[in-house]
Amino acid sequence: MAAWCIGVERGVLDPDAVTQRARGAVNALALLEHRAGLMVHFADALTGVRHGASEYSTIDTAIAVNGAVVAAQVCADAELSRMTEQLLARAAWTEVVHQSEGKTLLHMARVDRREDDYGAGADEEGWVGAWGMTAEQLTIYVLAAGHPDVDPATARALWQGFERPTGSFAGHTCVHEPGGTLFVYHFPQAFWPFGIDPEGLNWWHNAREASAANRAWCLSFAHRYPSFAAGLWGTAAGLGPWGYVVNGAQPATPPSPHCDGTVPPASLMGALPFLPEQAGAALSLLRGKHPLAWDERYGWCDGINLGAGPAKTGDEGTVPRPWYAPARFGLNKGVSALLGAAALGSTLVWDAYESHPWTARGIDVLGLGRAL
């Protein structure tokens, strides 16, 4: 939904059509199965019924609601605003909060049965995992802090509760995610440019350093992975030649990072506001030399691996055959549009996000500074 607003700003989508589309999307989200206001992660696109044994996800709920918040502000439509408020209010963040080893944390998901996705480690109430690490969850804290049922002290304790390990590679230092996967640094910034927090950590600078470290690490393994040898970088989670894979780079927590040489183009799009020259050069290379990575209707494929598949022999000798993901996932299209637009100077999404009463309240409660 936030990406549709970028389309309006750039004159490629009709404002009234986007308003109607956003109304329909928010209405569909409201009808999805949920637990404590957390939406089911995967649902049948035609019926809205929960798909398989899908979990009820905090982060995917947050991403969807973030989009609704932006659309409500940009479209300035009373009905859309009303439905968005209902989604915001429905999320029972107080039920998601728990204490662990003296820290206030949010669970990651909820399941109905232990046989459900991620259900093996569920507690008696069905809660799974905890956001105890640095990852992509920053906007969840903003949404929770903006909820009137969450007292400010609890909201601030949640922000302070997750681990912030620091690591370096090639002179680039950042607070890092355990697996070193790049998308986690970019996703929160797509909705709002997180700057300096009350502890003095600049999250925008952190994302820049993580991006630079990822690039340096990938290039240091150019001898092993053809994708990196070609000048590509940006290891992250996504579709790979052998299925879904969570790739990463240093800094990471041992024994991470895992890597199979796959690069999601969305990582390079996400890095554009932080490293415009380096990310732009890699995207230009990808666009110019690998036309199969691009689709005129949906844009970049979800992943590229230049060293996957059977080798082929030609005039240049035996070389690996490139693999291009057949899928184009909307999640990656959205973040690519938001951060790509930000790299071109647009602040539409950021301004809209912080202007909504709920998110404005959350940002204020947490004492967060805006980077740009």
For each predicted feature, which ranges?
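Ser/Thr/Asn(+Pro)-rich, low-complexity disordered segments
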Residues: 1-372
